[in-house]
Amino acid sequence: RSSDLMTIAVDFDGTIVEHRYPKIGEEIPFATETLKILAQERHKLILWTVREGELLEEAIEWCRQRGVFFYSVNKDYPEEEKSHNGFSRKLKADLFIDDRNLGGLPDWGTIYQMIHEQKPYEPVLCDRQKPTGDLSWIEKLLGKRNK
């Protein structure tokens, strides 16, 4: 349903990969797989990161090599230009996935479940009674898609 489609801003360091800035850390388990599924479901993904210049290009290329493509990078839409926006730099996203979230970053299985079921973090945790480390949700989803 198109009414359920969201614009999702995703941080890079500490969210998609472990914090090793300015280097690129190891992928956080299931990050790229989850992002690819969200893109296949037609959500608009925006890479929202402090990286700039060459460091930003390295992050974009790292994602591309793993099949993750973003609708835009550090802006609301691809054609947006800093010099012509005349308004706040704040993104107009429906959801932000960032390791600096209040309460920290849930695992990517929980993130997918929260988006898919449109539930906030607390009810998901209460339903599952496992706050972190349970990746069975995403593993089941990947298994279904690979059959």
Language-model features and meaning:
Residues 6-82:
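Alpha-helical substrate-recognition element adjacent to the catalytic core
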Residues 1-2:
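Short, small-residue-biased leader/transition segments that mark boundaries at the very start
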